[in-house]
């Protein structure tokens, strides 16, 4: 018989309100409280800006790492709405910043496609930061609201008139939450370069206050990405093959180039998120490549009906490929 324990009654059931749950169990939302989780904060804010870009409302994102350990992300998108929310009777900005599963990404008319943590991202960043300040530029005004560890620290303030449009999120990761709060320039730089390749024409800049700075913008998009990956390799094609199509609201973009290497290098993304474990888009690409090249070889008499068909591994030998899909309602096994 198990030993008798303390009484377990209704008053011992706790309900965590608002972002308290995020602070209590941060790893549930960002994976860890170590280096990876820390940088996930930056990625989440940037993902919001990228979502604006994917939906045609933003072409510039600027990230700055400040000397005090804070980070600011500025975009020239539409700006988070600041008018009063009809249900909650507070500014929409406050709802977005302080409540989980709040945002425009659940409305298909506002965001056709989006990445990130599906509506919890920026509020999680707020909850896991010592302080956060958001400046919004829209509808002829410059607005500001500040927060402390997920709680509203000041009401929405109209700072001035402004012809600008966009959002500036400035936050300081909380030392009470993270094992380290040192943001790494090189790690962020690598991710932002990747995002610039995946979103042709989007300019993403990263800088350190008083230090290094770099800006990425690739009009050639995925084709430039493949050329970058194949730098130093002997290619069998002068330029990468670029494929773009849309089927049933799914945008598919791929760039392919074969080299003399033996290994294949295929990188796949869904809504700008790397799908390292593959998925139906990768299996579809592989089967389509094998089927298409076999059909072409038969039509050109390079293969005869009685010959053995080309194997998938033979077709993909030396291939460098970037496959990027944009899906309205993606289902991720994990990010």
Enumerate the predicted regions with their spans.
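Bergerat-fold GHKL ATPase/HATPase_c domain
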Residues: 1-46, 95
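GHKL-type ATPase core
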Residues: 2-11, 69-86, 92, 103-228
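Conserved helix-loop functional segments at active or binding sites
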Residues: 21-24, 28, 51, 55, ...
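Flexible beta-alpha connector loops of hexameric P-loop NTPases
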Residues: 28-37, 81-87, 178, 273-277
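Conserved ATP-binding N-box helix of the HATPase_c
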Residues: 36-60, 121-128
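Short beta-strand/loop element within the Bergerat-fold HATPase_c
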Residues: 60-67
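GHKL/Histidine-kinase-like ATPase module
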Residues: 186, 193-195, 201, 205-335
């Amino acid at each position: 018989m198990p030993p008798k324990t303390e009484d377990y009654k209704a008053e011992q059931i706790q309900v965590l309100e608002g972002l308290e749950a995020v602070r209590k169990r941060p790893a549930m939302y960002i994976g860890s409280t170590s280096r990876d989780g820390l940088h996930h904060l930056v990625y989440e804010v940037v993902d919001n800006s990228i979502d604006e870009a994917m939906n045609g409302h933003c072409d510039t994102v600027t990230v700055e790492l400040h000397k005090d350990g804070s980070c600011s992300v500025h975009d020239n998108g539409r700006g988070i709405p600041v008018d009063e929310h009809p249900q909650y009777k507070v500014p929409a900005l406050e709802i977005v910043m302080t409540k989980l599963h709040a945002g425009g990404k659940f409305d298909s008319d506002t965001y056709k496609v989006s990445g990130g943590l599906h509506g919890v991202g920026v509020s999680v960043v707020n909850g896991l930061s010592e302080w956060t300040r958001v400046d919004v530029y829209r509808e002829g005004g410059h607005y500001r609201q500040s927060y402390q560890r997920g709680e509203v620290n000041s009401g929405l303030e109209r700072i001035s008139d402004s012809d600008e449009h966009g959002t500036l999120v400035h936050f300081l990761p909380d030392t009470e939450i993270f094992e380290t709060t040192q943001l790494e320039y090189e790690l962020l730089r690598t991710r932002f370069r990747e995002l610039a390749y995946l979103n042709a024409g989007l300019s993403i800049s990263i800088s350190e206050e008083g230090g290094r700075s770099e800006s990425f913008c690739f009009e050639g998009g995925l084709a430039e990405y493949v050329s970058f990956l194949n730098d130093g390799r002997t290619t069998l094609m002068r330029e990468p093959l670029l494929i773009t199509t849309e089927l049933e609201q799914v945008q598919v973009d791929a760039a392919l180039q074969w080299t003399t290497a033996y290994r294949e290098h295929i990188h796949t993304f869904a809504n700008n998120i790397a799908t390292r474990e593959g998925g139906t888009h990768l299996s579809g690409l592989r089967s389509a490549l094998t089927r298409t090249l076999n059909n072409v070889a038969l039509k050109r008499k390079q293969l005869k009906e009685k010959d053995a068909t080309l194997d998938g591994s033979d077709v993909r030998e030396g291939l460098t490929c970037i496959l990027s899909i944009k899906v309205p309602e993606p289902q991720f096994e994990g990010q």
